[in-house]
Each structure stands twice: as C-alpha cells, then as structure tokens.
Amino acid sequence: MIIARPRARFAFSDPVHFIALGFGAGLSPFAPGTAGTLLAFPLWWLFGGGATDEPLLLLAVLAFLFGVGVWACELTGRHLGVSDHGAMCWDEVVAFLLVLALTPDDPWWQAAAFFLFRAFDVIKPPPIRQLEMRIKGGFGVMFDDILAAGYTLLVLAIVKRVFF
C-alpha cells in the first residue's frame, strides 16, 4: 500500500517516522523538502551554530545523523510504500547542516547556500540523478542530498575565491 500524503498521525505513530519526516516538516503541503531544509537553521542555532573547537566532533555528529537518516528513511520508505517519498526530508536537514557547518557564519552566505542547495536538490545535475536512480533504500535517499550539498559548497567556494 502506498501512502500518497502522510498525516500527523503517521508521523507520530513511530519515532522513526517522526525523524524521517523531519520532525513533521515533511508534512508541509507545500514544498516539504524546502521545509526540511529550513528546519536545519534552528537546529544549527540550537547546537551553537558550529561554535566548537572540535571540528571532528561536529563531523562525527553529522555522520551519526546521516546514519540515523539511512535507518529512518529506509524503514519509513517501506511503511509509506515509496523508497524516496517526498515527505521524507531528514535527508535535506542533514545535508544542509553539513552546508551550514562549512559556510561562513553570515546571513548572506547562508541565504545563498540555502537557495543553491534547494536548486541542486531539485534539479539534480549529473551525476546526482543517475546515482539517485541506482542507489536505493535509505542510503540512496540520504546520499543524493549529500551530493547536492557538495555542489552547493563547491559553488560557494568558487564565488568566495573569485569575488571575495
């Protein structure tokens, strides 16, 4: 059975669903991936905006969140009947947290990062779309957004290098 549009009841029925649906952001009737990406901002600020002297700790936390996402999206995708359901937005949350971790702590850079990330996540330039079609399950759900984050960071690095 395929659940076309999950409701709050589904999200709250299992902690795994709640995580995969980005703490409910994926229930947004309009652009759930964008809602999930926006969720990364308050989470980033809640955790101190990366203000740490331990970059390896930050990397470890992001790797842990990625692993949780693989697990949560795998199970939730099975329960929804679609392996990469649009309501699952934990992938956007984690990938954009990675972008925020490597983006200057400036609202203009973060806004640019947000729009670039959303563009790359939606457009899926090569090889993102090809890999998304080949790599299935929770890992595939999470991985294509990490690639979109990589494209975002590459463009930001080029802009910073060339213009600033």
Where are these regions (language model features)?
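Short Lys/Arg-rich amphipathic alpha-helical segments
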Residues: S28-F47, L57-V61, L65, T76
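Membrane interface segments of multi-pass transport proteins and intramembrane proteases
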Residues: F47-A60, G81, I128-G138, F164
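Mid-chain, well-packed structural core segment of small domains
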Residues: A87-W90, L100-A101, D105-L116
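Interhelical loop and helix-boundary elements at the membrane-water interface
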Residues: I2-T37, V70-V99, A119-G150
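Residue-level signature of transmembrane alpha-helical entry/exit and packing/kink sites
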Residues: H17-F18, T37, E54, L58, ...
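Alpha-helical transmembrane segments of multi-pass membrane proteins
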Residues: W44-W45, L62-W71, A95, L100-A101, ...
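Juxtamembrane boundary at the C-terminal end of a transmembrane helix
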Residues: L156-F164
